[in-house]
């Protein structure tokens, strides 16, 4: 039975594509003074001037492919439901959600550019082949449910970078708009991610960087749409119908009048003729979590990185980045 699907359509789809500039630390490799060198590429702006001071920085263009798994709790409030053309009824006092858990497998393709020696800008496309939400209800009766859907979307962002005495830092912000199969309209997500790290080892052209950081996630609050009752519940069985009727029978007459259309449809032989309208608010249960990551610079063209998120929201990211100069230079 899928009663939880009436609610899970509003679960935040965190398409969590950590958009850290893959080579931000390279501009600020400590207090080592390198000799001035010739830089012909027109990008980044002011790149030639920076090169004249002996500061090394990455090739301006980059293409990256990332994969991420994320698991996090989500809070859902202000639940309203309606049947067909009936007015929406506030269910917040009747439906008590014990827990909502979101699991996401996501892929991200992005193109980035060092516009200035300290500023990276990028665009990205997101694909989530599997976003699973598990919901546990405690009232009006205990029930566990879950659903899986696909999500597509895209967005843009920017990363500011700085460094001092061998330590580098970045501050990244990005916005994505994601379209899920079971949600009306786009779900907007904003990620704010500061990081600080350093180069810990170098072997000729190969370098290893490690960092720590934090990520804040903000999602669009209100979610609404419609779903067929048959998709939400499946074919009602005797046990579920009994639970609904027992709950309905315990309501005072005024509240029974509000929910009578819904209960009548559940008790009918053809629940597929009814459509449930819904509206709810949602947010991530914890805005901030901690990040620990590392990047292996194979050469000036190829980079491999990995990052894990801990503390309530858990995540694992792996990525491959290829950098190149402006064509013709």
Segments and roles (model prediction):
Residues 67-73, 125-131, 162-166, 173-181, ...:
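Transmembrane beta-strands of outer-membrane beta-barrel pores
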Residues 59, 103-107, 148-156, 177, ...:
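Residues that define the transmembrane beta-barrel architecture of outer-membrane proteins
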Residues 26-103, 112, 123:
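Short glycine/proline- and aromatic-enriched beta-strand/turn motifs that initiate or cap beta-hairpins
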Residues 176-299:
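Outer-membrane beta-barrel transmembrane domain signature
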Residues 65, 104, 109-117, 123, ...:
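Residues on the lipid-exposed face of transmembrane beta-strands in outer-membrane beta-barrel proteins
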Residues 50, 92-97, 138-146, 178-185, ...:
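Extracellular loop and loop/strand-boundary signature of outer-membrane beta-barrel proteins
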Residues 75-82, 132-140, 180-187, 222-229, ...:
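Outer-membrane beta-barrel translocator domains and adjoining extracellular loop/strand segments
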